[in-house]
């Protein structure tokens, strides 16, 4: 249902025609900017409450004065409305909602769902079918867990492309960290049992798992299966050793602790996580607020949004009561398919965890405010130097990286007044240009980034930095002009004398040059953005170059065509396996004779190449 009045929006009339069903409502400004998303147990009553009487604070007054239209979505329950509200806030970023700003995806342990499951670190969208365990507050925790999984349960970690094409076990098998399912060195039922036990461990059931292994060990011993009993004994010993090292508190087996600190219209939510009694560390979040949101409102919004994307533990400790706690608890329990308890009045060890989280949240917020203050000062200095009337809300910077024209990559990094916005960084693999032509590379990258913005009505930067001189800047100008992009201030960042930091020249689109000097906060801001663009570009370039060089090693060998190349890679499970093989092993591949095997071996190891005379034509 949607109403767009010609003049002032009549909120009372709109609310009067709504049903009393639960649902989600959205408020829009006259230019269709989304102002606010909210949920309601009864739409008519909740929406009507905004327009009956005087708004209770300045934020509401400002928001309601801009409303030009509203629309609603009816849901089956208030819990369903809560979930939809969180999805819309995350995807649409309404101006007046508290929203979780999380530029990095959390790492998880992924256990795939296939005949021979693999276990691996995973970030990003859950495109792979399987169980996701986490989230972990850092990669270190995931790697420690994976190391334990390989040691205890010997599950494979290799990609499917390698797994399907191996003809002999890899190094992981040789050092006892994989059971070798790729070459049938473990029976399917035994591997499935290892997967089941690994799942129990990851679910926090290590005590139950230990009892089960002990029972199986006793059964094997009674059946005189001494080798199996010995393996189970070693597994149990490793499991107990791990538990003794890593348990912090047996009563904190599966627990998240959340504390919220507020100061100067800023907020910090600190998350302390325990899984299976292990302290996984802390992570800090700085939600976008409107300055008048209370700490309990901020924390409530965080709980709803964060656990809409991450699996909640069975117990979540909060440093304060949050609005609609029972509803949120019910929604989380439904989504997680297990009971989730929100608690704030706790004693003993749990009270200690809350105190620890609260102190850390306060300290982290003070540190962040100090850092933000300096960052905002540099951003304001940039505005003044460039003569802009409005604050600089978004800066983008492009850089090009290649090795003598090879594997050219362009980077685009994004900063706002608070610092880098890493979730919006982009890389562009450049193709179809003369190798080493930085001008063409820059133009292609600019065209690709801004064409998409034009087609999708995407956000544009206030300032666009180009790492380069007048030539690079001219290419960016031409690309933007072709696309009809206006109101973006272009600035070229040219190397200074002897390429020394602090001596950079800033080239404006009208040809002027600015040399603010090393002490300028504005130049320090530009240097920070430029250096980040350079880092991001060169990292992408090195990865692309390495991949290309690894692939091309076989292509450079006379006598190796597409068919033989595919046979070699399939037989050895990839270039790494082929490089580890000797000449005799290579010669056993169909279509490869001894002479060709010698040439392949020499090429891969940087040795003098034997004469290619007498070899068959490439296949």
Swiss-Prot record:
CDD domains: GIY-YIG_UvrC_Cho. The UvrABC repair system catalyzes the recognition and processing of DNA lesions. UvrC both incises the 5' and 3' sides of the lesion. The N-terminal half is responsible for the 3' incision and the C-terminal half is responsible for the 5' incision. Keywords: Cytoplasm, DNA damage, DNA excision, DNA repair, Excision nuclease, SOS response. This is UvrABC system protein C. It is found in: Cytoplasm. GO terms for cellular component: cytoplasm; excinuclease repair complex. The gene is uvrC. Belongs to the UvrC family. Pfam families: GIY-YIG, HHH_5, UVR, UvrC_RNaseH, UvrC_RNaseH_dom. SMART domains: GIYc, HhH1. It comes from the Bacteria. Residues 20-98 form the GIY-YIG domain. GO terms for molecular function: DNA binding; excinuclease ABC activity.
């Amino acid at each position: 249902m949607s109403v767009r009045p010609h003049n002032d929006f009549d909120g009372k009339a709109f609310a009067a025609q709504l049903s009393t069903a639960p649902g989600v409502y959205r408020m829009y400004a006259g230019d269709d900017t989304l102002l606010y998303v909210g949920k309601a147990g009864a739409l008519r009553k909740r929406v009507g409450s905004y327009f009956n009487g005087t708004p209770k604070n300045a934020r509401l007054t400002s928001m309601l004065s801009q409303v030009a239209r509203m629309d609603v979505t009816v849901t089956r329950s208030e819990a369903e409305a809560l979930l939809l509200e969180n999805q819309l806030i995350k995807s649409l970023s309404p101006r007046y909602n508290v929203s979780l700003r999380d530029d990095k995806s959390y790492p998880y342990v992924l256990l795939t769902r296939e005949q021979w499951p693999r276990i691996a670190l995973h970030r990003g969208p859950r495109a792979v079918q399987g169980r996701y365990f986490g989230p972990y507050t850092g990669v270190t925790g995931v790697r420690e867990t994976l190391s334990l999984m390989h040691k205890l349960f010997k599950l494979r970690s290799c990609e499917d492309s390698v797994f399907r094409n191996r003809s002999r076990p890899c190094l992981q098998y040789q050092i006892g960290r994989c059971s070798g399912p790729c070459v049938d060195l473990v029976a399917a039922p035994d591997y499935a049992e290892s997967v089941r036990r690994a799942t129990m461990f990851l679910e926090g059931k290590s005590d139950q798992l230990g009892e089960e292994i002990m029972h199986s060990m006793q059964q094997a011993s009674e059946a005189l299966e001494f080798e199996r009993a010995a393996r189970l004994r070693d597994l149990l010993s490793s499991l107990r050793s791990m538990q003794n090292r890593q348990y912090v508190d047996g009563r904190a087996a599966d627990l998240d602790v959340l504390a919220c600190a507020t100061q100067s219209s800023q907020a910090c939510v600190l998350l302390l996580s325990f899984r299976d009694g292990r302290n996984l560390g802390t992570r800090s979040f700085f939600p976008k607020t409107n300055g008048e949101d209370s700490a309990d409102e901020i924390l409530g919004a965080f709980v709803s949004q964060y656990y809409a994307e991450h699996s909640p533990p069975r117990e979540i400790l909060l440093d304060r009561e949050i609005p609609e706690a029972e509803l949120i608890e019910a929604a989380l329990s439904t989504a997680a398919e297990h009971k989730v308890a929100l608690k704030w009045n706790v004693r003993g060890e749990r009270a200690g965890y809350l105190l620890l989280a609260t102190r850390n949240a306060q300290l982290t917020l003070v540190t962040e405010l100090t850092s933000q203050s300096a960052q905002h000062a540099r951003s304001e200095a940039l505005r003044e130097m460039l003569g802009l009337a409005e604050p600089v809300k978004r800066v983008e910077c492009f850089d090009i990286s290649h090795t003598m024209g090879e594997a050219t990559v362009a980077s685009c990094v994004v900063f706002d007044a608070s610092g880098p916005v890493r979730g919006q960084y982009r890389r562009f693999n450049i193709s179809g240009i003369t190798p080493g032509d930085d001008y063409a590379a820059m133009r292609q990258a600019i065209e690709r980034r801004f064409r998409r913005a034009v087609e999708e009505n995407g956000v544009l930067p206030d300032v666009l930095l180009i790492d380069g001189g007048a030539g690079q800047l001219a290419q960016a100008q031409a690309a933007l002009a072709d696309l009809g992009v206006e109101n973006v201030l272009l600035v070229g960042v040219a190397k200074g004398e002897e390429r020394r930091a602090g001596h950079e020249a800033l080239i404006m689109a009208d040809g002027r040059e600015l040399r603010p000097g090393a002490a300028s906060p504005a130049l320090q801001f530009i240097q920070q953005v430029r250096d980040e663009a350079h880092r991001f570009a060169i990292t992408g370039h090195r990865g692309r170059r390495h991949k290309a060089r690894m692939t091309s090693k076989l292509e450079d060998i006379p006598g190796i065509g597409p068919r033989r190349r595919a046979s070699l890679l399939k037989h050895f499970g990839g270039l790494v396996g082929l490089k580890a093989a000797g000449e005799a092993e290579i010669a056993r591949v169909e279509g490869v004779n001894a002479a060709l095997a010698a040439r392949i071996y020499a090429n891969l190891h940087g040795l003098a190449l034997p004469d290619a005379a007498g070899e068959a034509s490439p296949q």
